[in-house]
Amino acid sequence: MATTIFGEHYISNQEYAKKLILAGLKQPTYRIEVDYIDFKVRGIGLSYFCNGERVSSGLFEKPGIYVLYENYPGADNCLYCGISGNSANNRIRRFMKGLCDCLRHDETHAAGTKARQFGVSFKNIHFKFLAEEDFPDKHNCILDDRYMDEYVASLLNTRFNKKVKQ
């Protein structure tokens, strides 16, 4: 635990990021399947699967943190970690559009685009999602939530996130 200048103990961003990772590891792994790509209108259709069963994208229409993997989740496969204040589904979709080279002129997702440029295929992307409502208790924390995904990304050694200095 970190200590303030007044001698009070608190949980730092780094320590809280570790708690998020542990909570996220308990979540199911989802597979993303690209149903179609329409280059004319710059659209994409996605389906999500868990244990071979199709699941609704509505599960991810809420705030939370998500981690995308190439192939199955593992130490060397972590592509990107993101956090959404509204809909994780929208952010996952934007990453996939960047990966499929299907972004409109008014859309960007640097990590998705960079992953495509480094040869990552959209055909075997998996992810884990932790809804904000399931985040660990923030009692006794002094957090900067704006950068929490970067702290998690740094611990997971993602390939396409900006990294925070430790």
Name every feature range the model reports, one short phrase each.
Residues 1-79, 83-166:
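Boundary/linker segments flanking structured domains
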